[in-house]
């Protein structure tokens, strides 16, 4: 049996901008992607904490250090700049692997600077905002 599990998430991210004319996706600062163990073109589920909206899209690499979280295309209608969102990726694995897998959680501040990260079930790793 194959199960769909949380692979990683960026928690407390703030939308920095939107571009309705772009074909679609979410642009995320490359440094945040690396810390959260996410990759370009990966499918994401985004939850808007301000209005409850949930939507799927895919990741585009943003400029490293920019702290950009930009919604593009139709997704730009799902959240406004300043809205707090959670960005999640998922993986498919067999039940044996799923029982021991520990997702990566990256927590950012209100400016999308990385604060800390951890694998669920493990201690936080404090991060410097100068990453």
Swiss-Prot record:
Its main location: cytoplasm. The modification Pyruvic acid (Ser) is found at residue 25. InterPro entries: Asp_de-COase-like_dom_sf, Asp_decarbox. It is found in: Cytoplasm. Substrate binds at residues 57, 73-75. NCBIfam families: panD. Heterooctamer of four alpha and four beta subunits. Belongs to the PanD family. This is Aspartate 1-decarboxylase. The lineage of its organism: Bacteria, Pseudomonadati, Chlorobiota, Chlorobiia, Chlorobiales.
